[in-house]
């Protein structure tokens, strides 16, 4: 594909990306999003409000339409361009791993995971949240620890507060820490990293008015062992409720790719943290989204073009990639791009980590991708 010709009407694109997507801005926006608790079913009231504030402060709100509940799906979305139909969608879920409180027995509360519980044993700092009517953010009503028994089958919340109502949401408490010497980020990376990347990209390319939808679904987290319909509920609603004449030609699903060995598979060996964004061909060994071979070849060609402009996009050839919102998209279209970032311990079997440099490369990658996807030649191949 002739990328130079495709992007010829945007000669200042890469200078614009370098100005809009910096390490400092990426870190600031990530911290604000990641350190906002957003258990499933609350994302638009919590992180959605933070994103709206960021857009207003940056002056970018005038260049896009902000939705805090697109099509009544619970999803936050940024709509760019003037056409009702958006040929290219980008998805990065906004909710975090969370648990629902059960009864208080033996001095602690049993928990029901509303996520894929990956910790096999140990204790992790946690908080209990209450949400008042009217869509306001969560209030911390108790502090304590999420405790997992040795076999990982039982999980509890231990706190000095004994009067919490059943169903109270419990989340891990890991305020962001940044090692600026190594550009390592520790904290709630899944999927604040992906959401921040899409937000940065949308702000950077919005003045070009591409017809693209940047969507941030709620309720991606869920009990994956029950099958594809037990999680990614927010993105499933997006596709079901989207007007039929507005379906995209392609979807990019952005989430964490494993950088270390974990319970479901090996970490990446070929791709390296700190060396850019990553793309892969399939998720969850084919149980999730699968990228068609022609689109995989496009990604290889695209990565070479980006490299000429200092943007790094690595092929993740051997690392395990979990299912994400691609499981919703794959029931409606074939062209699914799995582009994300390397991270470890995403569901708190240890302290989650990722590399801030990769966030910058990821934001630039998806921004350029959204513009390339406007090209009639590209759409003719992948529509």
Can you name each region flagged by the protein language model?
Residues 1-383:
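N-terminal hydrophobic/helix-forming segments and targeting peptides
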């Amino acid at each position: 594909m002739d990328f130079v010709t495709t992007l010829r009407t945007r000669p200042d694109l890469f200078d614009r990306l370098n100005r809009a997507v910096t390490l400092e801005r990426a870190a600031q926006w990530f911290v604000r999003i990641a350190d906002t608790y957003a258990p499933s079913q609350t994302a638009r009231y919590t992180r959605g409000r933070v994103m709206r504030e960021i857009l207003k402060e940056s002056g970018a709100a005038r260049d896009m339409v902000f939705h805090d509940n697109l099509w009544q799906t619970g999803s936050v979305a940024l709509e760019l361009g003037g056409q009702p139909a958006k040929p290219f969608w980008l998805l990065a879920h906004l909710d975090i791993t969370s648990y629902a409180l059960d009864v208080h027995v033996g001095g602690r509360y049993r928990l029901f995971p509303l996520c894929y519980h990956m910790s096999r044993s140990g204790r992790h700092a946690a908080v209990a949240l209450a949400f008042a009517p009217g869509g306001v953010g969560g209030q911390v009503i108790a502090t304590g620890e999420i405790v997992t028994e040795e076999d990982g089958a039982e999980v509890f919340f231990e706190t000095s507060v004994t009067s919490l109502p059943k169903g109270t949401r419990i989340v891990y408490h890991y305020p962001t820490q940044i090692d600026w010497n190594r550009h390592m980020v520790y904290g709630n990376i899944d999927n604040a990293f992906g959401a921040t990347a899409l937000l940065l990209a949308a702000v950077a390319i919005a003045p070009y008015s591409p017809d693209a939808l940047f969507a941030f679904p709620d309720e991606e987290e869920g009990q994956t062992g029950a099958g594809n319909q037990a999680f990614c509920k927010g993105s499933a609603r997006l596709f079901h409720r989207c007007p039929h004449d507005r379906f995209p030609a392609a979807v990019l699903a952005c989430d964490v790719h494993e950088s270390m060995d974990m319970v479901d598979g090996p970490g990446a060996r070929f791709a390296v943290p700190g060396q850019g964004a990553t793309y892969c061909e399939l998720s969850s060994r084919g149980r999730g989204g699968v990228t068609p071979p022609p689109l995989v070849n496009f990604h290889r060609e695209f990565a070479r073009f980006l490299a000429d402009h200092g943007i790094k996009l690595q092929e993740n050839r051997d690392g395990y990639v979990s299912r994400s919102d691609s499981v919703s998209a794959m029931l409606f279209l074939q062209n699914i791009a799995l582009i994300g970032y390397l991270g470890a311990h995403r569901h708190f079997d240890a302290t989650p980590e990722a590399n801030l440099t990769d966030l910058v490369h990821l934001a630039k990658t998806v921004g350029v991708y959204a513009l390339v996807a406007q090209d009639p030649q590209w759409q003719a191949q992948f529509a």
